[in-house]
Design a protein with these regions (language model features):
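Extended alpha-helical scaffold and adjacent linker segments that couple domains
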Residues: 1-351
Length: 351
């Protein structure tokens, strides 16, 4: 399983003999190395064919793996180090930045080595830089995968937030200077609290989350409810004003959800024509962050919709993909919050 990567070509080692023959490398690493040497311009094409692969493999063994423990394999960052001994200044600066960022948190993951691993995979263009592939390529001890993967995930999240990495379709890449500049511009776009509250209400309408509960049939009788936000917005086709379901916004629940539930139970205990829905808010911070990010990516799309620079246009296209992915994730989180809500009616509460 350590050699089974998501890629454009088969990577899995199929026999013990093949596993042993390539040790301390994995066979697939030579495919990656060849593509990386060509795409990174580390060597010209004739050198790749004649000497590049041999020279790099020898240097990895001589410099990177000479003191390694028996049964450990060559990590991707060791290959990257010897395949590109003089990375561009901008890339070297990214390595240093990532190293400093991760050095300030409690993690065993080295920022520069993580970025080298990602650079090797992304530039090879044959193995996708997903969390799983990055982890498998980063480690030397293949038995440590499940211990290291959560640390890699945490490190990737931190470096994405720091604008060192971009993630799109679950694939990670190191940001270019232009991408970094646009991301910094996007970060400065303010998304006020009232904007986020309004956006959540609009999303609840767009999802049509409450249409199915806006009417109820009992025999030949049909009862239509007014489903309203706690600010009075209609969240479903308008029903009877005498039967109301009030839906609270995630932004209007206090720090202690149960205290809010108890307060609503007291204030509505005599209202026979009114029920109240309190969403489950354990994912509130993530939802808040996602709403902000989606609005910021949308701002960048709108601002650069007529951009003439082809490089910027390409980045904005990537931003659109990222926004769409975050919007889907946001929908799942919001729907889960309201599907797991607490319903309050006449002092009673139920999930």
């Amino acid at each position: 399983d350590a050699t089974n990567l998501k890629s454009a070509f088969p990577t899995q080692t199929n026999s013990e003999a093949e596993f042993a023959a390539y040790y301390p490398f994995h066979k697939y690493q030579f495919n990656i190395l060849q593509k990386f040497l060509f795409s990174s311009n580390a060597l010209v094409a004739t050198q790749i064919a004649a000497r590049g692969m041999i020279i790099t493999a020898f240097d990895v063994l001589r410099k990177q793996m000479k003191d390694t423990e028996l049964f450990n394999f060559t990590p991707g960052h060791a290959i990257c180090t010897e395949a590109q001994t003089a990375p561009p200044v901008a890339l070297a600066n990214k390595y240093d930045t990532a190293k400093q960022i991760l050095a300030n948190i409690k993690t065993t993951v080295k920022g520069d080595l993580l970025l080298q691993t990602i650079h090797l995979l992304a530039d090879s263009e044959v193995v996708y830089a997903t969390v799983e592939n990055i982890t498998k390529s980063y480690i030397s001890d293949i038995s440590s995968y499940y211990d290291v993967k959560p640390e890699i995930e945490k490190a990737l999240e931190i470096l994405v937030d720091a604008k060192v990495l971009l993630v799109s379709n679950h694939h990670y890449k190191i940001t270019s200077d232009l991408e970094g500049k646009l991301l910094e511009e996007m970060k400065d776009f303010p998304v006020e609290l009232f904007t986020k509250k309004r956006e959540l209400t609009n999303l609840l309408k767009d999802y049509k989350l409450f249409h199915s509960v806006a009417s109820y049939s009992e025999g030949s009788d049909t009862f239509k409810f007014s489903v309203l936000s706690d600010q009075g917005d209609d969240l479903a086709p308008q029903g009877s004003p005498d039967l109301r379901l009030n839906v609270y916004s995630l932004f209007n629940i206090g720090d202690v959800r149960q205290d809010h539930i108890d307060q609503i139970k007291m204030s509505t205990q005599a209202k026979k024509d009114e029920a109240t829905l309190i969403p489950e808010n354990s994912a509130f911070d993530e939802i808040d962050k996602l709403i902000t990010e989606v609005k910021r990516y949308q701002y960048m799309e709108d601002k650069y919709s007529n951009e003439a620079d082809p490089n910027k246009r390409q980045i904005i296209r990537e931003f659109r993909i990222i926004r769409e992915e975050k919007a889907k994730h946001l929908r799942r989180k919001i729907e889960a919050a309201y599907n797991d809500a607490t319903l309050i009616y006449l002092f009673n509460e139920q999930l």
